[in-house]
Amino acid sequence: MKRPRLEHFKHPLRSAHSLLNILLISINRYKLISQFKNIPRIIRSKCWCGGNLAEYDMHKSYGVCIECGTYVNKCPPDPSKLTDIYGLDKYWHDRQRFGGHPSIDKRGELYRVDGRLDKWVEMVLKYGPEKGVVIEVGCAPGVMLKELELKGYDCVGVESNMDVVHWLRQNLQLNVHQGIFPEISLPKANLFLSFDVLEHSMEPLSFINAISEHLEPGGVAILQTAIDRYAVKPPFGKQFEKIFDDVEHTYIYTDKAIHRLIGNTDLRIISLDHRTSLAGELIVIGKP
């Protein structure tokens, strides 16, 4: 009688492994959804531009502005709870893990490997000043600010949660302030950076106006946010659920919305031509 060979068992083992992965993904998905299930929320019935909202049949939490096309979160978290949401444990450890993303201590390496950090540095070298003061709002995990510090810039970071601030100070020795922009005192800057933050802002017009107030004449700001400009349904394809996250993302923009947003300030658009990836579109604006 022949002994069973190892390969006879490989397929069942692969199947069991696949089922385990599916189960773990489902468990993490449940944890991600339930993590802030009971967080206090506010009701929003208008766009940041004042436009009325049409129903959006692809996500019940969002409406679509009939004026500028912005996707508007109709029930975002209460602003007073933002420092809790973006804490070191709840956000940078648990929420990232449940969503399948690296935690804060490993996120910087991801930015190096996937090319984001290189693209951001390239944008600074192409559009930004050769020296001066840099402000980065939402600077965790700190790799971009550290990179610019090593190039001789005078760097200032901002994070909303004090535990995250302590982590950045302790692990990267960065000058980081705690607060929610624009409700925080900061110096004037020659370069303003904010990657994947604008979509979180409760008041984007105040956010952009505050950028102008903090920029020296001739200063430049480089922002990254998801901009729906592609003939893809649902918007952003496989990243739809990640982008239409009604805990984190208050507004999701279109090119028309970005032009309107910047047009309401004294800043000028320099470029909308770059991106790090789908849903990682880059905005370059300058102060005359």
Where do the language-model regions lie?
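Helix-to-beta-strand junctions that scaffold the AdoMet/dcAdoMet cofactor pocket
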Residues: 201-202, 215-217
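A generic structural motif
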Residues: 153, 267-268
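Short "lid" loop at the C-terminus of a central beta-strand within the Rossmann-like core
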Residues: 226-231
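Short alpha-helix
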Residues: 250-265
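Residues at helix C-cap/C′ positions in short coil/turn segments immediately following an alpha-helix
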Residues: 172, 265-266
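Conserved N-terminal segment of class I S-adenosyl-L-methionine
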Residues: 3-195, 205-209, 222-224, 238-239, ...
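A short His-aromatic
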Residues: 196, 200
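C-terminal alpha-helical "lid/dimerization" subdomain adjacent to the S-adenosyl-L-methionine
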Residues: 243-251
